[in-house]
Regions:
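Histidine- and acidic-residue-rich, metal-dependent catalytic cores
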Residues: 3-218
Length: 218
């Protein structure tokens, strides 16, 4: 699969990596982001397993390569580390705020691309260079894709690259859905927040999320 939306290696994309591991970077996230990421990781793993069981994406090369039982534990890691790029932002910019100025919002929205670069750099032990080198390792690609593409949306309205439809990696689609499920369930005040969250997510089939993937929630 082409690295659609991949961070291009250039002088502008070099970053200073002060972390020695993903876990060290994870610990640099503010508590609420760490807690959210743990929940999203659990939902991602469950959705990943359900997607495999339902043959979601059957016949599509990218799905065949990535949607395999051997990657179930990896799916959890993809959910856990999907916001790792926020470790490269100041704490006050790690949590989205409605009051952000345009400049602050633009800074906040750099975290997915920074996350991919952080993941890739530590994979390659190239912390000093802070650049991404190509890889054909599916597990490595899935982690990079989850970081960079989880805020992309099916209709192309997401960020950072405005990808749409099948341009978005399967694992990123799943992490994005898991994150939205967590957000809705956390905001809904009722006895059955997950049931109501799923009802809301079904309305986004073909808009924010893949219709086929939404069916996994049924």
């Amino acid at each position: 699969m082409p690295n659609k939306g991949a961070v291009k290696v250039s002088a502008q994309n070099r970053i200073e990596i002060k972390y020695e591991s993903w876990d060290e970077a994870f610990r640099a996230l503010i508590p609420v982001i760490r807690q959210q990421s743990v929940r999203v990781a659990s939902y991602t793993q469950v959705l990943f397993e359900q997607a495999i069981a339902s043959s979601c994406g059957k016949g599509k090369k990218e799905w065949k390569e990535r949607m395999q039982g051997q990657y179930t534990d990896l799916a959890y890691k993809c959910g856990l580390y999907h916001q790792l790029g926020k470790a490269l932002l100041a704490p006050k910019y790690q949590l989205w705020c409605k009051a952000f100025s345009k400049k602050e919002l633009a800074l906040y929205q750099t975290y997915p691309a920074k996350g991919r670069l952080l993941i890739a750099t530590l994979q390659q032990k190239g912390k000093k260079k802070g650049i991404e080198l190509p890889t054909k390792n599916i597990a490595w690609l899935m982690l990079r894709e989850a970081c960079e593409q989880h805020m992309e949306r099916w209709d192309g309205t997401g960020y950072p690259n405005g990808l749409k439809g099948e341009e978005i990696s399967p694992i990123a689609q799943i992490v994005g859905l898991a994150k939205e499920l967590d957000r809705l369930a956390s905001e809904i005040k009722s006895e059955n927040p997950f049931d109501e969250a799923i009802v809301e997510l079904k309305k986004q089939a073909g808009k924010k999320f893949s219709p086929e993937l939404i069916e996994v929630l049924y």
